[in-house]
Amino acid sequence: MTLLEKTRKINAMLQNAAGKTVNFKEMADTLTDVIEANTYIVSRKGKLLGYSEALPIENDRMKQMLTERQFPEEYTQSLFNVGETSSNLEVSSQYTAFPIENSELFTKGLTTIVPIVGGGERLGTLILSRLESNFTDDDLLLAEYGGTVVGMEILHEKAEEIEEEARSRAVVQMAISSLSYSELEAIEHIFDELNGKEGLLVASKIADRVGITRSVIVNALRKLESAGVIDSRSLGMKGTFIRVLNDKFLVELEKLKNN
C-alpha cells in the first residue's frame, strides 16, 4: 500500500464509526495493518481499549495483561511523562512494550509511544511495537493521524456517556416529581427496607407499619415502573420482587431524603 492508500484506510475508520458504537478493536486492527506493528490503545487509566498483534508475544504476564485488558498502573502513570511522539525506543527503555523479563529474546524490539490528546486533555496512549525494522517518518505520520482519529472517538464515546447519564437523571427526576407526597413517602420506606437495588417487598407490611394504604404503594410502584426506573414482579402471597433499572434512582432518592 502507498502512503495515500494507508492514510485513506485510517480515514475510513472515522467514516465507518459515524453513528455506531466505537469499536477500538477494529481501529487497532487497521493500524496494525497499515503500520505493520503490534498496536495497543490504552486509556488514561491503563484500560486496554483495543489491541491487535502482528507478532503475538509468548509471555505469561503479557497474556494475562491482555486477558484482563489492563496495563500495570506504574507503567500507565509513566506514559504521562511522554508528551509527544517518542519513536524507536529500545527494549531497555522504561516504555518498552516488550516484556523486560525476556529482554534477551527481544534485543531488536522497538516501541513507539504516541500520546492521544483531545479537547485539551490526555485521553490515552497509542503504543506500537515491532522487531528489527525502525519506525519511519511515514509510520509516525500514520501513527499520529491514527492517534488523532482514536482520540476523536474517545471524545465521542465520553460525550455519549455524559448524554446517557443526563438522560437517566432526567427520567428519574421526572418519575419522582410525578409522585404525590404520600407516594414519595411510601417509596422512601420501600427502598429503606430493600436496602439495595433489588429485593422482596410485602406491601401490606409496609402499609401497616408506616400508616398508609396499600393502594398508595401500588400506585407509586406503577408510576416508577411505567417510567422504566424499576421493574416489579408479583410473587403472589410472598410479595413483590422489585429491581432498580436506573442507577440514578437511588442516588436521587438519597438526595431527597437528605434535603
UniProtKB/Swiss-Prot annotation:
Disulfide feature: none
Compartmental location: Cytoplasm
GO terms (BP aspect): regulation of DNA-templated transcription
DNA-binding residues: 203-222
GO molecular function, one term: GTP binding
Region (GAF domain): 1-155
Any one of the GO CC terms: protein-DNA complex
Pfam families: CodY, HTH_CodY
InterPro entries: CodY, GAF-like_dom_sf, GTP_trans_reg_CodY_C, Transc_reg_CodY_N, WH-like_DNA-bd_sf, WH_DNA-bd_sf
Keyword terms of this UniProt record: Cytoplasm, DNA-binding, Repressor, Transcription, Transcription regulation
Coiled coil: none
Function, as annotated: DNA-binding global transcriptional regulator which is involved in the adaptive response to starvation and acts by directly or indirectly controlling the expression of numerous genes in response to nutrient availability. During rapid exponential growth, CodY is highly active and represses genes whose products allow adaptation to nutrient depletion.
Family, similarity comment: Belongs to the CodY family.
Protein known as: Global transcriptional regulator CodY
Source organism per UniProt: Listeria monocytogenes serovar 1/2a (strain ATCC BAA-679 / EGD-e)
Lineage, broadest ranks: Bacteria, Bacillati, Bacillota, Bacilli, Bacillales
